[in-house]
UniProtKB/Swiss-Prot annotation:
Its cofactor is Mg(2+). Binds 1 Mg(2+) ion per subunit. Homodecamer; pentamer of dimers. Catalyzes the reversible reaction in which hydroxymethyl group from 5,10-methylenetetrahydrofolate is transferred onto alpha-ketoisovalerate to form ketopantoate. It comes from the Bacteria. This is 3-methyl-2-oxobutanoate hydroxymethyltransferase. Its main location: cytoplasm. It is found in: Cytoplasm. Pathway: Cofactor biosynthesis; (R)-pantothenate biosynthesis; (R)-pantoate from 3-methyl-2-oxobutanoate: step 1/2. It catalyses: 3-methyl-2-oxobutanoate + (6R)-5,10-methylene-5,6,7,8-tetrahydrofolate + H2O = 2-dehydropantoate + (6S)-5,6,7,8-tetrahydrofolate. InterPro entries: Pantoate_hydroxy_MeTrfase, Pyrv/PenolPyrv_kinase-like_dom, Pyrv_kinase-like_dom_sf. Belongs to the PanB family. PANTHER family: 3-METHYL-2-OXOBUTANOATE HYDROXYMETHYLTRANSFERASE.
Amino acid sequence: MLPSDLVKYKEQSQKIIALTAWDSISGSIAEQANVDLVLVGDSLAMVCLGYKSTLPLTLENIIYHTNAVSRGFKKKIEEQPLLVTDMPFLTYQCGEDKAVEYAGKIIQSTYAKAVKVEGAEPEIQKVISRLIRMGIPVMGHIGLTPQSYLNLGLKKQGESLESQEKIKKDASILEKLGCFSIVLEHMPELLAKEIQNNLTIPTIGIGAGNFCDGQVRVTADLLGLNDDQPPFCQPIIQGKHLFKDKLKEWVDSERLN
């Protein structure tokens, strides 16, 4: 799977399904579930490393975990899901040259075929444009952008008319810059629908309703492994309680033997 294949999916009205992964096991499970895209998201800072936000994640962390995820893929290369890696905080907000260097390290050091960049501010636009010119495919991300939570919080975006117009403008800009797809996070469903209708590249929604060209979820949220669930992700099982109870049963039985 290549970034350009996602555009074909949109052209054919074929839904794109994506999950996050953070190690070999989660990567293998995602591949076996037949997802189209696996995102090594900076959410692994919280899911896997125990941080309270995505901000402490380093370039070295994301490279390490991307390689672990890719080792979980067992299908033929052409049949594997598209592997996309988040650029961590301050690896692309530090100027074009450094951003190219850091994104280049991700692509060179892992099997990722694209990077994801949050935001569409003028400085970020320059970075995205430069990365794409250098041959590095970029997935955009607008709406709720977790790396900006110190300024914007983690609240739903696009609630005001002004905010909606900005998000629509940002989406158009990202398409013109050459992004192959855009993540739309935690925004009104009708806003996401309008953006989806106006773009020729696919939109991947998370907390943005059902009209996007695809859906992505943090796997740990979907499996109910976290104590704090985002309001837009309903777990399909209560995994943490299930695993805890089963492990406790085993511990108790072993103590009796």
